[in-house]
């Protein structure tokens, strides 16, 4: 049996640059892995079947699940149709939260089954396969802190910070946001401000490359968090506004933002102890607002084989 850890991510920067010729949005992002993680276990089977179980009954375990789609793609590319596996998912990352939980689980399937079946694919091979399944999935394979361009699949690693930064995640467990809706709404509201060509896109990429990410504490300025979808989602989602307001009320928070298309929001803290203290401070208000919270350290890797 092989066990794989599949971490969540937050977006430290999500900039919608414009529209691509294929209809997708051109993005410039900084994504960061955190230690809130799902756990997947993989065992060989002799019947050439791919099966998935999960400890969260609300999650679909049918063929539409990214875990099984990733497993099928990897097996197809291997040429060994007789390969089979039983997969069990312990779900810890909230579903539909803007934290790439599904993408990370799919990436974990590629990494875990590559090892279980002894296929020998490189990380680069797995990232290319991941890109066929989802825009966030290559990042989930690589993890750590990455600049992410294109649809999010083009990665450039950012050196890890020497500082023990942490994030306090906050989410209403009853609320989810449709990612396609968020980008459609962004287009409706902001298309007049979109950049028009590759030269303009590259200028913004270069500007992002010049930012010294995750090392803002040398000055009194807050970290340069940005999420263009926050301006779209927050006005129409009370749970996002409540989460941002609560996080912003904590004096120790360095900056706050929504992650991905939401509705999860996070505050950035100088260390895990400060983060946990803030969670304790907010406990009554969080409960009153129906919000759940997680104190998380940053991770320097993506999906990882644990055993």
UniProtKB/Swiss-Prot annotation:
Coiled coil: none annotated. Pathway: Isoprenoid biosynthesis; isopentenyl diphosphate biosynthesis via DXP pathway; isopentenyl diphosphate from 1-deoxy-D-xylulose 5-phosphate: step 3/6. ATP binds at residues 94-104. It is an enzyme of class 2 (transferase). The keyword Transferase applies. It catalyses: 4-CDP-2-C-methyl-D-erythritol + ATP = 4-CDP-2-C-methyl-D-erythritol 2-phosphate + ADP + H(+). GO terms for molecular function: 4-(cytidine 5'-diphospho)-2-C-methyl-D-erythritol kinase activity; ATP binding. Keywords: ATP-binding, Isoprene biosynthesis, Kinase, Nucleotide-binding, Transferase. Its EC number is 2.7.1.148. InterPro entries: GHMP_kinase_C_dom, GHMP_kinase_C_sf, GHMP_kinase_N_dom, IspE, Ribosomal_Su5_D2-typ_SF, Ribsml_uS5_D2-typ_fold_subgr. The active site is at 9, 136. One of its GO terms (biological process) is isopentenyl diphosphate biosynthetic process, methylerythritol 4-phosphate pathway. It holds the Pfam family GHMP_kinases_C. Belongs to the GHMP kinase family. IspE subfamily. Catalyzes the phosphorylation of the position 2 hydroxy group of 4-diphosphocytidyl-2C-methyl-D-erythritol. PANTHER family: 4-DIPHOSPHOCYTIDYL-2-C-METHYL-D-ERYTHRITOL KINASE, CHLOROPLASTIC. NCBIfam families: ispE. This is 4-diphosphocytidyl-2-C-methyl-D-erythritol kinase. It comes from Synechococcus sp. (strain CC9605). The lineage of its organism: Bacteria, Bacillati, Cyanobacteriota, Cyanophyceae, Synechococcales.
